[in-house]
């Protein structure tokens, strides 16, 4: 079992990289990929860069060159569910673009042309994440995560996303692109992120203050999931 783990920013991958045994670094296309073992599990950890294009480039490189069996997207997210606070966990059941609009041609809001309306997270990975949440006694919500090339900071964009996707639990800038590429490569994926801010008019201040908290919580989730994946033989 080889697990691909993807984070956008240095703060989101640093704690995991420090745990990799016999770490080797590959730099390609503006991305860095760190390979080795965490707790005996083969890992390829990608630092992709921020945004959908960077995430898609990095995920493609990861899948083409390192062939992980599954992919976990880690890092931070802005919470939209009322039950979420800073440090809580969100787990994707599906991911959608909040800034894609080809509805003029009969597609659903957020659906890219010639693609499914949503990219569905692997149910087995979702269940493993839920088991880890239970064992760690963390507060968590699972559901739809939406991505777009904008940091959501203000009432108008927040209202638009909630109006268009009333079931959304969190927003960020990479996971749907990652899910899109995994769909194209037929690779199981799940998004497991920690809340760094509650998406509102002050979210940029909260993000700066609490990113390290989110990084700690999301990294803890990944290492706990790796322990469970150690005994899995296939997906």
UniProtKB/Swiss-Prot annotation:
Pfam families: PNP_UDP_1
A cellular component term, taken from the record's GO annotations: cytosol
GO molecular function, one term: adenosylhomocysteine nucleosidase activity
Catalytic residue positions: 12 (proton acceptor), 197 (proton donor)
Zinc-finger is among the record's keywords: no
Annotated residues for binding of substrate: 78, 152, 173-174
EC number from the UniProt entry: 3.2.2.9
InterPro entries, per database record: MTA_SAH_Nsdase, Nucleoside_phosphorylase_d, Nucleoside_phosphorylase_sf
SUPFAM superfamilies in alphabetical order: Purine and uridine phosphorylases
Keywords associated with the record: Amino-acid biosynthesis, Hydrolase, Methionine biosynthesis
Assembly, per entry: Homodimer.
Family under the similarity heading: Belongs to the PNP/UDP phosphorylase family. MtnN subfamily.
UniProt xrefs under NCBIfam families: MTA_SAH-Nsdase, PRK05584.1
Role played: Catalyzes the irreversible cleavage of the glycosidic bond in both 5'-methylthioadenosine (MTA) and S-adenosylhomocysteine (SAH/AdoHcy) to adenine and the corresponding thioribose, 5'-methylthioribose and S-ribosylhomocysteine, respectively. Also cleaves 5'-deoxyadenosine, a toxic by-product of radical S-adenosylmethionine (SAM) enzymes, into 5-deoxyribose and adenine. Thus, is required for in vivo function of the radical SAM enzymes biotin synthase and lipoic acid synthase, that are inhibited by 5'-deoxyadenosine accumulation.
Official protein name in the record: 5'-methylthioadenosine/S-adenosylhomocysteine nucleosidase
Gene name of the encoded protein: mtnN
């Amino acid at each position: 079992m080889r697990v691909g783990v993807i984070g956008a920013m240095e703060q989101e991958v640093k704690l995991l990289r420090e745990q990799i045994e016999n770490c080797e670094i590959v730099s390609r296309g503006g991305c860095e990929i760190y390979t080795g073992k965490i707790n005996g599990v083969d890992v390829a950890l990608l630092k992709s860069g921020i945004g959908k294009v960077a995430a898609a480039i990095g995920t493609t490189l990861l899948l083409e060159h390192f062939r992980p069996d599954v992919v976990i997207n880690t890092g931070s997210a802005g919470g939209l569910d009322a039950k979420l606070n800073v440090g809580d966990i969100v787990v994707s059941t599906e991911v959608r673009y909040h800034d894609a609009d080809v509805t003029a041609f009969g597609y659903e809001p957020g659906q890219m042309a010639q693609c499914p309306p949503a990219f569905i997270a692997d149910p087995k990975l979702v269940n493993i994440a839920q088991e880890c949440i239970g064992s760690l006694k963390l507060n968590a919500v699972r559901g739809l995560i939406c991505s777009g090339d904008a940091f959501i900071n203000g009432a108008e964009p927040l209202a638009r996303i909630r109006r268009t996707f009333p079931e959304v639990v969190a927003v960020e800038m990479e996971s749907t692109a990652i899910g899109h590429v995994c769909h194209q490569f037929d690779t199981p994926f799940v998004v497991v992120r920690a809340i760094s801010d509650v998406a509102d008019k002050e979210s940029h201040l909260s993000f700066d203050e609490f990113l390290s908290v989110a990084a700690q919580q999301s990294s803890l989730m990944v290492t706990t999931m790796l322990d469970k994946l150690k005994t899995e033989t296939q997906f």
